[in-house]
Amino acid sequence: MAKKKSVDLFNESPTPKATAKKSAVKPQKTADKGYSAADIEVLEGLEPVRRRPGMYIGGTDSRAMHHLFAEVIDNSMDEAVAGHASFIEVEFMEGNRLSVRDNGRGIPVDQHPKYRDKSALEVIMTTLHAGGKFGGEAYDTSGGLHGVGVSVVNALASDLVVEVARNQELYQQEFSRGLAKGKLKKVGEAKNRRGTKVSFVPDEDIFGKIQFDPARLYSMAKAKAYLFGGVEIRWCCDPSLIKDKEKCPTEDTLKFPNGLQDYLEEQIGGRAVVTPQ
């Protein structure tokens, strides 16, 4: 039997002739600006975050600014979930200042083995990809951006203060726009206290005149409490900043022993359900 001749559709089809069109845009003569090693920038420290905040928090709008809160509270949540903290305090104050405090182990304040002129606290706050969540020894589970979160908050804050109660001593260090304003200093004793407090004001050079929304902050804190059942989050807000008291109380204790089950029960309310559980 004669073999069937295979048909190559590409060969059989005639090739359309390209019609030359004159470009509507006339090429412009540009001076040769050159491109040398001197044009290669190396951004150090937290400068990349300030130059391109969208790469780290998704933009410079209200949603992005509120994400700063998520990064700070995630560090405290990690301490609570790991069993080292029993509560987290969130306070929103005048001047667009937000603080998050926990009673966890406290950020280490001793000298860092690699950067001997800095404390571990300063390294964490001023260096990208510095933290205790990479090796898996300090934390079994963790949230946030793993070594990026709190340093990004520091980079995008016009004023940030960290207080650490550790080894019965109280330490404090101040920062502005990612840079330390001074060295870590001991400010007192903390015999019956431990943990970390981060207080910050978002930088208007980055976010403009955008203000934190108390109702949104409260909702975010409540969501964290639902997500990690049993963790206690204490909410406090300056009454003068609250526009809708139904959506945001001045004070509240958020603790849900059953976690997401409690959330579902709140959403369902009195409606009939298909199954009892």
Model-derived features with residue positions:
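Conserved short strand/loop->alpha-helix "switch" segment adjacent to the catalytic nucleotide/phosphoryl-transfer site
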Residues: 51-69
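Short basic (Lys/Arg) and small-residue
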Residues: 124
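Conserved ATP-binding N-box helix of the HATPase_c
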Residues: 63-87, 149-156
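GHKL-type ATPase core
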Residues: 2-3, 7-17, 21-39, 96-120, ...
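Short, intrinsically disordered, charge-balanced linker/junction segments flanking boundaries
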Residues: 272-277
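Short beta-strand/loop element within the Bergerat-fold HATPase_c
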Residues: 87-94
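Alpha-helix capping/hinge segments and adjacent helical runs
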Residues: 45-46
